[in-house]
Amino acid sequence: MKVITTAPTERVMTKSIPIEQVAAFAEGPFQGNPAAVCPLQTWLPDSLMQAIAAENNLSETAFYVGSEGRYQLRWFTPRCEVDLCGHATLAAGHVVFQREPHLETVEFSSNSGPLMVRRLGDQLTLNFPVQPAYPCPVPDRLEAVLGSTPEACLMGVDLMVVLADECQVAALAPDSAAVAELPGRGLIVTASATEVDFVSRFFAPSCGIAEDPVTGSAHCSLTPYWAKRLNRSDLLARQLSARGGMLRCQLTEERVLISGRVIPYLSGVIHLDC
C-alpha cells in the first residue's frame, strides 16, 4: 500500500480527462460496487491521480494507458494506491469494450501481474491470480471486533475470518478504528450460505474504505478456501453489503475466474485548471 498526498505538486498540460462511473458485480441499478474509470493517453503525476480519486470519493478509481486490448492499469482509493482491485478492473474492462467493441478480451498489466478480462454476453470475467490465505492464530482484539468467536482465522493479503452462519456476517457492525488496528490490508468476514455457496463482507478502513460494497480481489482468497471446503471449483457468492453484489467464481489451478455484470451509471469529463 502506497500512501500518496492528495495535493498535486506538479503541473500538467492535460485540461480535461474522460471519466466513466459504472457499478461492477451489480444485479440492477444502485447495486454492486461503483468505480470510476479514467482512460488516459499518458500517465498523470501520482499526486494528481490520488487527488482525483479522493475527489471521486469512491472505493476505487482506475486509470489505464494503452490501446488495442493491451493496457497498463492502476487503482487508487481515496487515500492510497493499491496493488489489486477486482471490481475496478471489471469496470475498466467494460470501458475498454465500450470504446473498442471489436474486442472480446482485454489484457491489463499491473503491479499484481497480468490480468485478463473477457466478455460473454452480459457477463464479464476476471482472470486473477490466487491469493492464498493460511490458518493463523486469532489476533488480539479480533473477538471484540466481531462480537463472537470465529470458526477459523486465516492470513494472506487480508485477514480472513469464518463465522458460523450468514446471519452473523449480515449483522456485523465493526468499529472502523478497531478494524484498522488488525493485521492485513483489510478484514474479510465469510460464512457458508443457503441460497448461494458462501457470503462475505470486506472492511478496509486503513485504505480509506469503511466497508467495500463488493470486493473482487477478496475472492482471490475466498474462492480457494471455499473450493477446498465444499469440494468443488465452481461457486456462487454474494457480498452482503448494503448495495450487495453477486459473483460467480471458478478455481482453475493458480488462477481465479470471477464473473459478474457491469451496469453503467454516468459518463463525463474532469476539468482541470492547469
Predicted region positions:
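Active-site proximal loop and beta-alpha junction motif in alpha/beta enzyme cores
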Residues: 2-6, 10-85, 89-274
